[in-house]
């Protein structure tokens, strides 16, 4: 499958899995926003600490606005292979194209590590 138009860089699998782990920790001990609309609002308000975007979103226009918005607002973002993984990590029984971590809770150190590695990727 060709790379979607909104994917701007390749994320190593271990970094993607750490991002999902941070999302799960934030879900249990902090605060998250589930779905593209809520993630977009969190970025626009400047409260998102990390945005997780699925690479298999169809049609891609659903999340195509998120990477440029995150860059404009200096919000780190990461891609994971499947949106079903995003939904599961967010505690949903359905897939989710995107999610945002608002308060990392017990995953604060993990989140800081992810952000450092993302800055090195770009």
UniProtKB/Swiss-Prot annotation:
NCBIfam families: eL8_ribo
Keywords, sorted A to Z: Cytoplasm, Ribonucleoprotein, Ribosomal protein, RNA-binding, rRNA-binding, tRNA processing
PANTHER family to which the protein is assigned, alphabetical: RIBOSOMAL PROTEIN L7AE FAMILY MEMBER
Species for this entry: Methanothrix thermoacetophila (strain DSM 6194 / JCM 14653 / NBRC 101360 / PT)
Subunit structure: Part of the 50S ribosomal subunit. Probably part of the RNase P complex.
InterPro entries, per the entry: eL8/uL1-like, Ribosomal_eL30-like_sf, Ribosomal_eL8/eL30/eS12/Gad45, Ribosomal_eL8/Nhp2, Ribosomal_eL8_arc
MF term (GO), any: ribonuclease P activity
GO BP, one annotated term: translation
Subcellular location(s) per record: Cytoplasm
Protein name: Large ribosomal subunit protein eL8
Entry function: Multifunctional RNA-binding protein that recognizes the K-turn motif in ribosomal RNA, the RNA component of RNase P, box H/ACA, box C/D and box C'/D' sRNAs.
SUPFAM superfamilies, alphabetized: L30e-like
GO cellular-component term (any): cytoplasm
Keyword Cytoplasm (UniProt): yes
Family designation: Belongs to the eukaryotic ribosomal protein eL8 family.
The keyword Isomerase is assigned to this record: no
């Amino acid at each position: 499958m060709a790379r979607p138009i909104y994917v701007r860089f390749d994320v190593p699998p271990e970094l993607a899995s750490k991002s999902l782990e941070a999302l799960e920790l934030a879900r249990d001990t902090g605060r998250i926003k589930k779905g593209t609309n809520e993630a977009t609002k969190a970025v626009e308000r400047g409260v998102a600490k990390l945005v997780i975007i699925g690479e298999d979103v169809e049609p891609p226009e659903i999340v195509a606005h998120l990477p440029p918005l995150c860059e404009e607002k200096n919000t780190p973002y990461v891609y994971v292979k499947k949106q079903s993984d995003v939904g599961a990590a967010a505690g949903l029984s359905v897939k989710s194209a995107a999610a945002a971590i608002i308060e990392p809770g017990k995953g604060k150190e993990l989140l800081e590590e992810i952000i450092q590695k993302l800055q090195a990727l770009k």
